[in-house]
Amino acid sequence: MDVNILTMFVTVSALALACSLWIASYLRNWRKKGVYPPVVGTMLNHAINFERLHDYHTDQAQRYKTFRVVYPTCSYVFTTDPVNVEHILKTNFANYDKGTFNYDIMKDLLGDGIFNVDGDKWRQQRKLASSEFASKVLKDFSSGVFCNNAAKLANILAQAAKLNLSVEMQDLFMRSSLDSICKVVFGIDINSLSSSKAESGPEASFAKAFDVANAMVFHRHMVGSFWKVQRFFNVGSEAILRDNIKMVDDFLYKVIHFRRQEMFSAEKENVRPDILSRYIIISDKETDGKVSDKYLRDVILNFMVAARDTTAIALSWFIYMLCKHQHVQEKLLEEIISSTSVHEDQYSTECNDIASFAQSLTDEALGKMHYLHASLSETLRLYPALPVDGKYVVNEDTLPDGFKVKKGDSVNFLPYAMGRMSYLWGDDAKEFKPERWIQDGIFHPKSPFKFPAFQAGPRTCLGKDFAYLQMKIVAAVLVRFFKFEAVKTKEVRYRTMLTLHMNEDGLNVQVTPRLNSD
């Protein structure tokens, strides 16, 4: 018996020693390859912190620059390290793509558009879009549209000021931005900003359906694969999504058909400047007239989805920051006045003066507004339109900080959290401080891997300059004619979505006309 016990003891000890040696060897080899980022939670933590999700990520990022949240299907890796961001978006770009998960979720709305595809489809569309966004014709056309819609928005605020009414700015910016984008993208006046528009008209129906479809697609991210069951049976949110996408498609296909007919009968020199018209011409040349309406539908809808939210959300948070920092508002006013040809005694809050001031915002005038550019960038630093963005790992890789990611992992960078990291922006990182972008009176941009509000690398946002152009025109007109003060109700918070919308209450402000006596 004693021999058996001794034998068992020796055997167990030997096995334990062998296991220990194997584990030690395994860990040494693992470290050479890179280790997984520390786990800070599971999908349960995401669910518990859903209402403050981006702040939850920020809290974790203050402990670890790179960390993991574990889900049953895969690991979600998050990073705020600019070196990792550069690796993902540029250095090893080919190893990180959109993935089939996101593609499936977005396909019904975005189709095979540029923001929903990888590989050759993406490269082909990127090449064509790059050429178009560099054209002077499109820029001049867009500038005129932005100026006109900024004036319309300012006139609505002027009427509210006369009646001493507060206004909800996020809703106004969303509608104004939709008007601008629809005009630039497919040359149609939606007029969603106008209170006199026909609520039952096709343009109004399209605008509503477009908003609902966006919301329902986001809902798919929240319910996991269950949306596929709902879609199969056409029930719940999927039934709503299908109905609204049909309304969006019906409207867009009619616009495309009408534009084709219009261009077929028009003289070549009378080419319209909107994106749809230009894409029809260029695509028909490249495909010998065989470009499909579905391709055109995907192209213009992708541009709409990307452009609409970016500017509207940024402008909403910009006005919120001005309400909290009145000295910035006054400093901006001084710069805007000194940068334009419209003098103090030549304007009032009447319609014609607002319109003429908007038209005075030339490239030269806007180029002088360094503090305005800095203020908008500072807003985007703290409140990026896309607070979380990520890719899927194609093949196992090791990030520059030494952490390993495996095939199928979701690797995400955190623009919202990055804007609040003291190791990136200093001890005052959480403060709204436009001066951090200014050197000797001149705006100085930051590395896009530190400030990825417009992505970086090969997928850098093609519409970045157009977004700044629209934001600067709208901001200059509004600050020039009005002073903004927040209406003290509930605290302004974000609503956890794909984009950084304010919560349901939006941003209620009181606007006061800036009179000559100011």
Swiss-Prot record:
What is the designated name of this protein? Cytochrome P450 704C1
Looking up InterPro entries in the UniProt record yields:
Cyt_P450, Cyt_P450_E_grp-I, Cyt_P450_sf
Q: Does the keyword Acetylation apply?
A: no
Q: Which residues bind heme?
A: 461
Which topology term describes how it sits in the membrane? Multi-pass membrane protein
- Residues spanning the membrane: 5-25, 299-319
Which Gene Ontology CC terms are recorded?
membrane
Required cofactor names: heme
Q: Where in the cell is it found?
A: Membrane
Establish whether keyword Transmembrane helix is in the entry: yes
Q: Record's CDD domains?
A: CYP86A
Q: What SUPFAM superfamilies does the entry give?
A: Cytochrome P450
**Which protein family is named in the record?**
Belongs to the cytochrome P450 family.
Q: What is the lineage of its organism?
A: Eukaryota, Viridiplantae, Streptophyta, Embryophyta, Tracheophyta
E.C. number: 1.14.-.-
Mind listing the GO molecular function terms for this protein?
Answer: heme binding; iron ion binding; monooxygenase activity; oxidoreductase activity, acting on paired donors, with incorporation or reduction of molecular oxygen
Question: Which keywords has UniProt assigned to this entry?
Answer: Heme, Iron, Membrane, Metal-binding, Monooxygenase, Oxidoreductase, Transmembrane, Transmembrane helix
